[in-house]
Amino acid sequence: MEIAINRLNADKDLEVFHDLDVNYVDTSKTAGPRAARTAALNNATVAAMGLMRDCYIQSTILNINLKIAVSDVCEMDLSSVKGFDQTSVLMNSQTNSLAKSVMYFLDKYQWKKVALVSPSAVLTAFAARVRSDLLDALTANKIDILVDSRLDPMSDITEKVKEDAEKARIFIICDWSSNANLLRNYIFKLGEMNKMQSGEYFVLGYISYDTNYQWLEASSGDQRLVHLGASDINDYNLTENDLHEVYKNVVILSDGPPPAEPNSTWEDIKTQVLKKKPAKMCPPYCNTTISEKITPRWDRIKLLFDSIQYLADATNDALNIGANIYQSDIFYEHLISRKVDSVTGVTEYIDGYGAIVGSMQIYYHFSSSSHNSYSLFPCARLAQSSLLNTVWSLTDYSEGLSIDFVNKSAPKDTPVCGFYGENCGPPANNTFIIVISVGVAVLIGLAIAAAFLYKRYRYERRLHSLFFMIDRNQIILKKHTNLMSQQSLRSMASIHGSVVAASQTLRDSHFFIEDYNNASSINASSIFNTGSTARAGPFGPIPGFGGVTGASEDEKWHQIPDFGVGLYEGRTVALKRIYRSDVEFTRSNRLEIAKLQESVNSNVIEFVGMVVQSPDVFVVYELAQRGSLKDILDNDDMPLDDVFRSQMTKDIIAGLEYLHSSPVGCHGRLKSTNCLIDARWMVRLSSFGLRELRGEETWQQEDDVQEGKDQLWTSPELLRWSTGLSQCGVLLVQKSDVYSLAIVLYELFGRLGPWGDEPMEPREIVSLVKREALAGKKPFRPDMAVLKESPRIVQETVVAAWTEDPLNRPSLHQIKRKLKPLTIGLKRTIMDNMVSMIEKYTDKLEKDIAERNEELEAEKAKSEALLKMMLPEVVADSLKLGSNVSAESFENCTVFFSDCPGFVEMSATSKPIDIVQFLNDLYTVFDRIIDQFDVYKVETIADAYMVASGLPVPNGNHHAGEIASLGLALLKAVESFKIRHLPNEKVRLRIGMNSGPCVAGVVGLKMPRYCLFGDTVNTASRMESNGIPLRINCSGTAKEILDQLGGYEIEERGIVEMKGKGKQMTYFVRGENSDMRRERIIRERVKFASLKKAQIQEKTYEFS
């Protein structure tokens, strides 16, 4: 206690709480100890500490005396007083700490079935509540308690452990006994039965620190541990290695203080306590003999220091804000729901009921040689992470909790087959199982073999049946012109220029395709690579196939040039001639055709079949409606942007990737004329496969100029290959495809043909490509200057892809990854990109429209506000609806006029700008005041201010009262009004009011005004002009209405001669009773809606 008090006196942070002293009261040897304790508690001024375990009576005494009770060992249950005014604070661990810790592990490992083991001895009240809280938590979380054993730790529990082990896998052992005999015995028995070593069992143990602190503290000096000792396993059939395996599936929980950590404060306190230990503890234990061998209760010492520091911090906080600490209900608010910084270095919390939240220490075994082989070491702490976050979490020490399960994973709470084998069938005879298994395996093998043979048979039969052959009578030939006419290409020229142009292009293209599908002729030479023109038939030059009157079917097919178009099974197909008079379909040919028919991908042209009727041989393909990539590149009216080029590049690479991974294996003839464009503007590769059939073609070039033109995209190694493409390996052709891809990219981004502006003839270019490298010269390639405006990654890719050595060329995957920046954000096809562009434009347009609508609404609101400032709201609403606003008669209303006597003289002696500022300031004040009344401001002319009530919305007889109350408010306001340029002058406001019938209506087209007409208006004006400054001159008719309303003080002025009116009896309105007006308005608001805007004044205005 003295050490703790000395620490507080030395704490400079405690600004108003210092110079403490200790008042000890030892009642252990006095007569009537209970009476002495009661007297001591009654003498407490603010708080008392050091209450006993059963502190109910002591806390009650302090509660009755409105004093604070701070206990570090009290075990009473505050649940019975929660919700009532109380003054008790409990600093020891709570009974639900074990339940929260156990639920942490059960939730973490999803254990839903457990066994609960505890001593059979009578429990203390505190231990009983701990067990009760644990049972409640297990029930609330739907945890099945398979076993609930209450055992004598000193008896033989072998049979009971064996019985429990057959019913459960996860054990919760709560041991409140000294030396934890039940926990040791139970764990070692499970180990002796080889249950723990199997990894299927787990023990979550609890040791009461209160009954085991001596051996827990004495085990290892500063580093407290759970020491089970070598001698403990002598009576069991266990080795040290067995013990290590057992410990892997054991976690121990304890409610003691944290173990020693590198905490200078706690270490200093321990040193001071140990130095003081041999001395006689007087005070306070002057009548008691203290053993020098007693083990210090570090948990009690920790709680004592924490309690004193906690009470000091709370008192200091209360005094700093001026709180009265002698008033317990106020001081108690500073004690609850606050953080407690323990001297051990951890953080704890006091809840809203004055009880500490508590925590739980975790012990686990480590196999490190630096640790005792028989001990479990403190590795973590379970506690609440903050005052508001009630979920418990781990606070790691230097070791940290890492459970090394026997089987490397947490055991299941239920065996695979259940505890009684209910989840598995009965055991079967092994011989029978083996025979059945072998039989089933043989049958499955035979079935697989039969299925394979049947599939093979069907495949061979299909190959033999020439499934791909098409009877030419099933194809209807069509005339052809130019598929992609100049007009169509021009309509596509602005495909990426703007969204509007793109939309128009879609409509144009759709119309063209429909025309074509209906009947228009078509030029198939724009679909596949060309090499010759239409041949002359027996009837002379043929302008188009199928167009010669009287020609036979054979003649029509024989007159088809390199390419044709027809209708097959309801769809348009392309016909490509193979220059062979006949074809003998060998097995290898049929296999190659089968691979072609299996190659289906969105980036390759579909193979439909073949037409073979000597001497004509055609391959039937799916038709690409928009021609080839070369057609587009050769058309100067077709602008190409980066999106177009990037999408085309993406499609070409995707098609090649598919072919290289498909049974076809390669392309072999990649060029821009074989990159076809379909209706969705997607590139689809054609003219691949059939290498053996096409390798034997016999047609010749038309002239020398065209010779070598089809070989401008071919790689050097294939040009040198004398045996033809059909004899090349797939890998070599794949590398050749990479070279051809480079030429296509050069053509696509340069747009000057496959070899740019090279002036040589194609056959000369092919010859140089084929021979230059062999002669030791630099390989001949297109001029890279053509691509100077292209992206750098494209230039680098082209150069790498047309490298002379095929093995040094990049793979398609590498090329795709290199060019990925070009395709980021692109859709699947160009058409999808166009749709995306339209959608973005639409979204932007909708956003712009919404913004314009918001601006329009804002301006509309301003216009309406301005209109309502010029005209009454009901009149303005009628005008907005287009209704005619006719003049309206009002049976009764009150008109108000006011002016400022002396205004003319002021105007003569003041600057015009000063007069303007004066009137603006005055009327601004007036306008703010009239908003509080059910009145309408008609107009202002110079210093004259005109207001009316009872129109345009009638309000019964309240119009006279609203005008009178307004006049009183204005007179009150001018008392404090300052004239800027004449600060010493006062505004002497003169007011006149009159009630009676009136006619009102809108007058004029330009700057229309709501005007009032009638004798009532004239009389009100005379009342104002014949009035007295700072007075409200009231007519007799207005006075009668005010008398009916009540609450107004009216003084008779007398008869006044008025111009045009003769003699009139007049009155002064002197004041009002605001309570009567309030009651009147509240009562009549439902009847007269216009009264809702009238604000009730809290003051009564009176003038003498």
UniProtKB/Swiss-Prot annotation:
Annotated Protein kinase domain ranges read 528-823
In its keyword annotation, does this UniProt entry include Coiled coil?
yes
Which cellular compartments is it found in? Cell membrane
Disulphide bonds in the chain: none
**Which stretches face the Cytoplasmic side?**
453-1104
Q: Which Gene3D superfamilies match?
A: 3.40.50.2300, Nucleotide cyclase, Transferase(Phosphotransferase) domain 1
Q: Where is the Guanylate cyclase domain?
A: 894-1024
Which positions in this protein are listed as binding ATP? 534-542, 576
What enzyme class is recorded for this protein?
Answer: lyase
Glycosylation (residues): 43, 237, 263, 287, 407, 429
Q: Which SUPFAM superfamilies match?
A: Nucleotide cyclase, Periplasmic binding protein-like I, Protein kinase-like (PK-like)
What's a GO cellular component annotated to this UniProt protein? plasma membrane
Q: Which CDD domains does the UniProt record give?
A: CHD (cd07302), PK_GC (cd13992)
Keywords assigned by UniProt, alphabetized: ATP-binding, Cell membrane, cGMP biosynthesis, Coiled coil, Glycoprotein, Lyase, Membrane, Nucleotide-binding, Receptor, Transmembrane, Transmembrane helix
Q: Which residues lie on this side of the membrane: Extracellular?
A: 1-431
Q: Which Gene Ontology terms cover its molecular function?
A: ATP binding; guanylate cyclase activity; peptide receptor activity; protein kinase activity
What is this protein's function? Guanylate cyclase involved in the production of the second messenger cGMP.
What is the similarity comment for this entry?
Belongs to the adenylyl cyclase class-4/guanylyl cyclase family.
The identity of this protein, by name, is: Receptor-type guanylate cyclase gcy-15
